[in-house]
Amino acid sequence: TLCLNVTPTSIECQVANACLSPKGEFEYLQIDAPTPQALLSEIEKCWHRHRKLWPDRTINLALAIHGQVDPVTGVSQTMPQAPWATPIEVKYLLEEKLGIRVMVDNDCVMLALAEKWQNNSQVRDFCVINVDYGIGSSFVINEQIYRGSLYGRGQIGHTIVNPDGVVCDCGRYGCLETVASLSALKKQARVWLKSQPVNTQLNPEKLTTARSEEH
């Protein structure tokens, strides 16, 4: 199975066997996908490239997709920070085009499943939090993924923490993502750097330390 972590700007690729052991090299790709069709095309190209590396194997797809996903129909309902607002029938379109089995789910759900299958601690209840350009989470309760109504559970990134804060991509103000996601932290770092003397010599590794010492 070719496992892909898909966002509007990148795809992470890893082939794995039925025991979830990695096969071949991990790959990180930056992509330019201005439309749903362009995103599907990038996924197809990635699959064809790996298919050539394993010509004697059936390479199915497992897609971890950011945003709200219907795992039954395989539809990406919303993908935050994507330049489109329409749902994408990912599973149907890729299965028709490639002639393989395609599994689609939310990226945080996939992280929780991996933790459940790979962790030997036998914990029955836990939460996985994914901090990227957004913030998401997934809950495992009594060893089962908690999905909630309309598969919208775990959207903690859109919990309002500052009603007077900056506008979020979801249209509301002061969501957690606007202050604690990687994209928000990068923006805050750029603003802080501009307030420093011109001759300040800083690199990303020392930035956190310098900011902490200031306080």
Which residues does each PLM region occupy?
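A mobile "lid/hinge" subdomain adjacent to the ATP/sugar-phosphate binding pocket shared
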Residues: I65, L176-E214
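Short, surface-exposed charged micro-motifs
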Residues: C3-N5, R101, H158
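Hydrophobic beta-strand positions
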Residues: V15, Q68-V69, F139, I160
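Hydrophobic "anchor" residues
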Residues: P22, S76, I145-Y146
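Glycine-rich phosphate-binding loop of actin/hexokinase-like ATP-binding domains
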Residues: Q122-V179
